[in-house]
Amino acid sequence: MEKRILNLNKIRIDGIPVIIWGKPSDKMILAAHGSHSSKIDDCIWVLAEAAINKGYQVLSFDLPQHGERVYETDFIMPDECVRELNLMYTYAMKHTKKVSLFGCSMGAYFELLTFSNAVIDRVWFLSPVTNMERIIHNLMNYCHITEEVFQKKVRVDNDIEPLYYPYYVYVKNHPIIKWTHKTFILRGENDTMCEYDTVKSFADKFGCELTEQKNGEHWFHTNTQLDFFRAWLEERLI
């Protein structure tokens, strides 16, 4: 993907590496990346290019154990991600008038946990995890373990994503039951991680617009996929 040179500023918020994309504006998008990604992932770069052209500023940051924080050893937990997203939101609200969200994969899930009661203008989700418990159950089946075995082992490593029992308990205790923000969702037709029926159920329940890219995957990384994502965004950024 050819990347344009953008106006960006590297800062730290409570020690967390952050990039502010674009010039000061009265509207800002808070962006949360997915697993094995970072604050400068291709999809966030595309978002920044498209959003800046529409007059937005974008804030992206590295989640625990990602990007500049790969040295961290503590298992990434949802409650810590919620805490950090709230820090970013507080910063954004001090520097702009309207805050919107972008979330990719698990980043979208953490935003769902964090912002159900916040003042949010608009939301754009790419390949969002809308039901983390189902994904964990799918991984448990893949690893051929029961919940009882999982509880005893606490951590189960595999070739997809490690399973951690306290994470699972948190997910079960924090279901997504409220989401009233105007939300646009893009997923790939062949996304096997966030299955169609799960995402469709979420979209129907909370009145979200759902778009599929034909032959698309969970990870939007090819030029064709990113071009589709860019066009989709540009039609929905106002």
Please state what every model-predicted region is.
Residues 66-95:
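Catalytic nucleophile-loop/oxyanion-hole region of alpha/beta-hydrolase
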Residues 36-48, 63, 197:
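The serine-hydrolase catalytic nucleophile loop
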Residues 101-103, 126:
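Short beta-strand immediately N-terminal to the catalytic nucleophile in serine-hydrolase-like folds
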Residues 103-111:
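Gly/Ala-rich beta-loop-alpha elbow adjacent to hydrolase catalytic centers
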Residues 48-70:
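Conserved alpha/beta-hydrolase
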Residues 4, 118-201, 205-212, 216-220, ...:
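The alpha/beta-hydrolase serine catalytic core
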Residues 26, 33-38, 189:
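Active-site glycine-rich loops that stabilize anionic/oxyanionic intermediates
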Residues 1-24:
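N-terminal cap/lid segment of alpha/beta-hydrolase-fold proteins
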